[in-house]
Each structure stands twice: as structure tokens, then as C-alpha cells.
Amino acid sequence: MAQWNQLQQLDTRYLEQLHQLYSDSFPMELRQFLAPWIESQDWAFAASKESHATLVFHNLLGEIDQQYSRFLQESNVLYQHNLRRIKQFLQSRYLEKPMEIARIVARCLWEEGRLLQTAAAAAQQGGPASHPNAAVVTEKQQMLEQHLQDVRKKVQDLEQKMKVVENLQDDFDFNYKTLKSQSDLSELNGNNQSVTRQKMQQLEQMLTALDQLRRTIISDLASLLSAMEYVQKTLTDEELADWKRRQQIACIGGPPNICLDRLENWITSLAESQLQIRQQIKKLEELQQKVSYKGDPIVQHRPMLEERIVELFRNLMKSAFVVERQPCMPMHPDRPLVIKTGVQFTNKVRLLVKFPELNYQLKIKVCIDKDSGDVAALRGSRKFNILGTNTKVMNMEESNNGSLSAEFKHLTLREQRCGNGGRANCDASLIVTEELHLITFETEVYHQGLKIDLETHSLPVVVISNICQMPNAWASILWYNMLTNNPKNVNFFTKPPIGTWDQVAEVLSWQFSSTTKRGLSIEQLTTLAEKLLGPGVNYSGCQITWAKFCKENMAGKGFSFWVWLDNIIDLVKKYILALWNEGYIMGFISKERERAILSTKPPGTFLLRFSESSKEGGITFTWVEKDISGKTQIQSVEPYTKQQLNNMSFAEIIMGYKIMDATNILVSPLVYLYPDIPKEEAFGKYCRPESQEHQEPTDPGSTAPYLKTKFICVTPTTCSSTLDLPMSPRTLDSLMQFPGEGADSSAGNQFETLTFDMELTSECASSPM
């Protein structure tokens, strides 16, 4: 199998790393379009030989032209546009340096191979690799590591120069004092001054050399601080910011965030280098106190250099204090950032500067809405107190990887009650599930004479008082983290921004893929788009308001889109997870599409879809049959809800479902799961096998056992549309009488089912129904 095809089948955590490999330098779209050709070329050889690189690059442009022609024939305007843009970019950037693109592609292919090896090793071990995310290093990260190595080398070089200048200064100081004492003695004895003048000239030469070396060191220090500033900006403004954004995405069901260990190593390395430089700057002060002169560069520049390195170190320490694990209730691990009052929640903070001397030295304090103060009262938000163990000392022993961290496991929130029942302002415009609160972590660092105040915040949390508020609270968390990377915008919902369908579709798919093994397909998402936006051809870029997503009722329904979808998600997780993971549930499909795909199938073909009218979440099956005149009929059963699925699994309902005609003959209308999977093959393994054990008499002296029973779902119907079903009817030996008249099954071709407790003789009990 081609390498690219193998990569597409990897778990989500590996696909996230695959995405990080590609950038504008080598777009993933190009990798997708030309996968077989790209894998057939020797890019490593091209990266080392310019003539071959030029040939491969021109062949690449030719392959792009051929692919463009194919898209032209398919009238695929979007792909045509993207491919033309990619070709223009490649020509402008790599036409004069084809070895560079060869090196980039070779590196990507090599990293892909490593990723596949890591995934394969994890599969053989029956679990995830130790750190699968650590296997991929992007080109940008390679450059960052190179910059860090350069910084460390410059620090070492500077230390050597400092030793040289110290030795030179000691020589100068010794010679100067010796000459001074000799000069004093010569004046007393009246000796010749020519020797003294000669030694003075030597001292002047030494002082000139000392001054030049000092100026070189000052210049090197300034240059090194600039390099450190660049690396630090890359670490904090790019790498750490990217990690925080990925953490946001992971919180709302997106791909799992990568490990912090690599970032910790980088930041710790930079912090160590900064402290070394600070010691060198202090050493300059000592040298200045021993020897100084007019125009001394140390006097002029040392204070500014020291101020600069201290500021860099302070900022690095502040940025390195992060929330590694966001607030989450242990009973709801898939819905972090929603906290119920009175229920314990956990979170974890970490300092990415791993200095052993800081172990057990930093005491962390937790508070909520620290910066809000009276502002919260003005906007009507509730106020809370944090109960439980709200202080903890950071240490390296509790973490498996030895990181300097503190985990809070026993925190709870209690609302501060006001005179009007809890809310500071009864005129508040936001409902409680739109209120955002910040949990703050504070500590102080004392290190090498510096005192640094550290503070970090959780992502905004929603606090609920009843679990029934969870769906709307989770919708708020989704909307916030989907649309902003501002970690402190607690007023977000006073004027919530508009999202696009592309953003919403991705997040909706995550709600399934994060808790099951399957996300949503393009067709399923299109059906959801139609529910939200109405009929359309292309929903890409269409705007969706917060109110439409969560607050307004859908057309013709008494509930919002999100309430409906969230209940379906709950239905999937609790009742039909295995069937969803198998891909047996089509789920979201319009009735028009449903009719179109079933009408061409043989009678007995059925599909499973979610109910559009059930607020609490329901699932139904629709099948095709032919009436007595040969006309195709599409029938749907009344949706099954959570309450019904509590008593009987959906697989057993499908396997045992029957239609009863006017002559009391039972027929199974469900034969093939769309497109052509035999019902028994799909659902048989999820049904409980009937006991074959010998039944003992239940009454003393009795020789006959009780009859076994089995629950089945039956739809009574007076029509004769079931005559052409491929499954032959079977008359049961014993059948209970209907309780009342049959339900109306004619409205909307939707059948209502009745559940029967069927008595079976010992003979028929062992045979399938």
C-alpha cells in the first residue's frame, strides 16, 4: 500500500502530527494530488545533486500540469484554483534553488516513514507509543533547535573570552602596581626614568588590548542578547502559543495536544543560558571595580545589559508558567471547562523551566475571577468561592516525567449568595451558561537574588448549578474556543462573534470522533448544514450566529439545533456506540436522499438514521418494500428513544423486528443493511445468545419447565405491502393477543411499534425467530 494511503488510516493523534509536517513550503494538497509520483522519486539524491534536483523539479511542474488537466475535465474549479496557486508559488520560490524543495520533500517523506513506524510499534504493543507526538520534528522546530545550539555555543565562547580578559586584566593590574612601586622607589633613589617610561608604554599597550577585548565582549553580549530575544520570541509567541491553541482545540474534542516535554527542554535550555550570561555580566562589574579607566565600555554598557537580561529572564519565567490540564470534572472527562457547583474538579499547572533547585520551593494559590472584582457585579455575573485544597507546592515527584508541576484534585466551587437570590444584578443580559469565569494560579519565585511574581489563568470556564445546564454550557465552551484564542475574554458572549459553517462542521465532527471511533462524513455534515442553514448547494463560508446554533428553535421544531444534536451525541455514546463505530448508522441523512438511495435497492434493504423530530434523541430505521402492485414503498418505524433502549438493545430490536399483517402472520421487513450487508452479519454479534441450558421444573412435582420468553418489536398493519418481502413469514406456535386496536401506520409512512413478550415452547425456543 502506498505510504500516503497508510498515513490516512492512522489514529487521530498521529494525523495531527502529519498536519504539522506540511506548510506553505510544501503544501499538503500537493502531497495529496501527486502522492504516487512523489513517492516514486529519489528526493534524497536530488537534495544532494543540483542537476538531478533541477530535472526532478521540472518533472514536478509537468506532473502538476497533468493533474490540472484532469481537474479541468472534471470541472473542479476549486482544485484548479489551488493547483494553479501552488505551481506559481513553487516557480517563484524554487526555480533557482531546486535542491531546497528536494530537501524539504525528502525530509517530509522521511518523517512520514518514522510516523508509520511509531504507529506500527504502538499497535504491536497494544497501546500508544511512549510519546508518539515526539517523533515528528517540523522544519521550523529544527531551525529553532539550531538557534538554541548557536546560543549555547556563543555562551561558551563568551565564557572563554571572559577568562582571557580576566587573565589580561590580572597581568595589567600586577604590572601596573609593580611599576608604581618601582617608580616611587626610583624617585627616592633618583634613578634613571627611561626604564620606567618603557614599562609605561608596555602598560599602555596592555590597556589598549584590554579595552579592545572589553569592547568585543560588550558587543558579543549585545549580539547574544538579541539572539536570545529572537529565540525567546519564537518559543513564547509561536511554539508556546501554538501549544495553547492546540490545547483549546483538544478541549473541544479536536486532535489531542502534543506533549510539553520538548517545549520544556527548549525553555529550560534558554533559561540556563540566560542565567549564565547574567553571571558573566556580574563578572564584568567585578572586573570594572578592579580596573577602570576613562571611556571604559563596561561602565557605559553594563547596566543596560544587566537590565536587558533580567527582563528577558523574567518574561521567560512568566511565560513558562502554564495550565497543563484545564479544569475538568472527573465524571465528565470529555467536557472540560464546565464546572458544577459542589462537584470536585481537577486541574494541573506546570513550570516549563525545570530547575532542580526550585523543587518544593513554589507554593501555588488558586482563586477565581481575581481580576474581575466589581466589574463582575456590574455585568451581573455570579460570584464564587473556591473550596478544598486551594494551595499546593510544586514538585517533581508527582509527575511521571519529573516535570515541575502541581495538580489540584479536590477543588469545588460554591456560589456567593446575594440578597436577590445569587446574581449580583437581576438585569444581567447573559444567561448563566454564557457567563465566563477565570481560575487563576499565583506563586512567587526567588532565584539568584531575583523575585518574580508568576500568574497564569485557565481558559474561561462555565459554572452550572444543575447538570441539565450541561448541554448549553458545553455549547458556550465550543463556541468560545472555536472562534477565539484570547484566553481571558470573559465578556465574549456580550457580543458573540459569528462563525462559518467550515468552522462549525469541523467542531461538530469532533464531538463524535473524540468520544467514538468515527467522526462525521461530508454527507452527514451536509445534512446538518441543511438543518442549520436551509437548502443550499455549497455551504462553505456560510455564516452561523450563536443564537442560530444554540438559542433559537429550528424551523417547525420546539427546540434548538444544538439541543437536538447534543441529545443524539448522548444517544450514540450510551446506547448505540458499537454500531456507530462499525459505520452501520448512516445517522444524518435527508429524507429526499434516503428515498433516492433506497428506491434502487431490493426489498428488505434498510438504513439507520437519527430522528429529526425527537428532542431527546431518537433513532429509527427505514426500509424499502413493494406493494401488491409492484410499486416501491419506503417505510420508517417510529423512532426509538433512550427510554426504550434502556430496556432492549437496538441490535436486538433490529434482529427481532416484525410486521404483523391482517392475518396475524409475522414478517421481518429488514433483510440487508444498506448497501447490501446481511442483517445477521451486521447485528448478530451484538445480540445476547439464547440460553441452550436444560431448564429444570420450577414447581415441586412438576415435570414441565416454564416456557421461555423473548421480547420482540412488532408493527401491526392492515396493508398487504409485505407480500413481496424476500423473507418468508413464519407462524409462531403461541402468540399473545393484541392489547387494543392497532396503531395508525399510514401517517407519513411511519410505523408505530408494539413490544411483545412472546411465549415460546421448549421446541421453538431453541430455534431462531
Curated annotation (Swiss-Prot):
Q: Which GO terms describe its cellular component?
A: cytoplasm; nucleus; plasma membrane; RNA polymerase II transcription regulator complex
What is one process in the GO biological process aspect for this record?
positive regulation of DNA-templated transcription
TM region positions: none
Read off the InterPro entries from this record: p53-like_TF_DNA-bd_sf (IPR008967), SH2 (IPR000980), SH2_dom_sf (IPR036860), STAT (IPR001217), STAT3_SH2 (IPR035855), STAT_linker (IPR048988), STAT_N_sf (IPR036535), STAT_TF_alpha (IPR013800)
Pfam families, alphabetically? SH2, STAT_alpha, STAT_bind, STAT_int, STAT_linker
Cell location? Cytoplasm; Nucleus
- Residue ranges annotated as motif Essential for nuclear import: 150-162
| Family per similarity comment | Belongs to the transcription factor STAT family.
**Protein name (Swiss-Prot/TrEMBL):** Signal transducer and activator of transcription 3.1
